[in-house]
Amino acid sequence: MPNFNRHQIRQAAFQVLFTLNANQSLELEDAYQAVLTMDQFDAEEVTPVEVPAYLAFLVSGVTENQAALDAALTPYLKKGWQLSRLAKPDLIILRLGLFEMQNSTEAPAKVALNEALELAKQFTDDQAKGFINGVLSKFVEA
């Protein structure tokens, strides 16, 4: 999959961030290659894939700004809830969506929100999708 569209890049960003969250000793480049070369799973020799610039922007942005993203998201949780109580896929999608909404010059906030909901549809359940929509839509309105 050498040419990635934006939706595929966002899917890959989610997968890389999820992989890094699950295995914190994994090197970033190894996480990128694990995700980007999945279609070569049966190949005898895996050919490394160049990391798309927008993928690197999203992943590095979320990892480097995680504390600020978490601080921005926390006020929108139900009373008594903490980010640590959220399912990891939900939290990763919230961080990724919020980072893109706040920092991408290429995707308007509404597009970033819609893409976050597409990730939620693929990687979480309907209840989580509704929660993610409720939280991130606050940032579109702001």
UniProtKB/Swiss-Prot annotation:
<keyword id="KW-0889">Transcription antitermination</keyword>
<dbReference type="GO" id="GO:0006353">
    <property type="term" value="P:DNA-templated transcription termination"/>
</dbReference>
<comment type="function">
    <text>Involved in transcription antitermination. Required for transcription of ribosomal RNA (rRNA) genes. Binds specifically to the boxA antiterminator sequence of the ribosomal RNA (rrn) operons.</text>
</comment>
<dbReference type="GO" id="GO:0003723">
    <property type="term" value="F:RNA binding"/>
</dbReference>
<dbReference type="InterPro" id="IPR006027">
    <property type="entry name" value="NusB_RsmB_TIM44"/>
</dbReference>
<dbReference type="GO" id="GO:0031564">
    <property type="term" value="P:transcription antitermination"/>
</dbReference>
<dbReference type="Pfam" id="PF01029">
    <property type="entry name" value="NusB"/>
</dbReference>
<keyword id="KW-0804">Transcription</keyword>
<protein>
    <recommendedName>
        <fullName>Transcription antitermination protein NusB</fullName>
    </recommendedName>
</protein>
<keyword id="KW-0694">RNA-binding</keyword>
<comment type="similarity">
    <text>Belongs to the NusB family.</text>
</comment>
<dbReference type="GO" id="GO:0005829">
    <property type="term" value="C:cytosol"/>
</dbReference>
<dbReference type="InterPro" id="IPR011605">
    <property type="entry name" value="NusB_fam"/>
</dbReference>
<keyword id="KW-0805">Transcription regulation</keyword>
<dbReference type="InterPro" id="IPR035926">
    <property type="entry name" value="NusB-like_sf"/>
</dbReference>
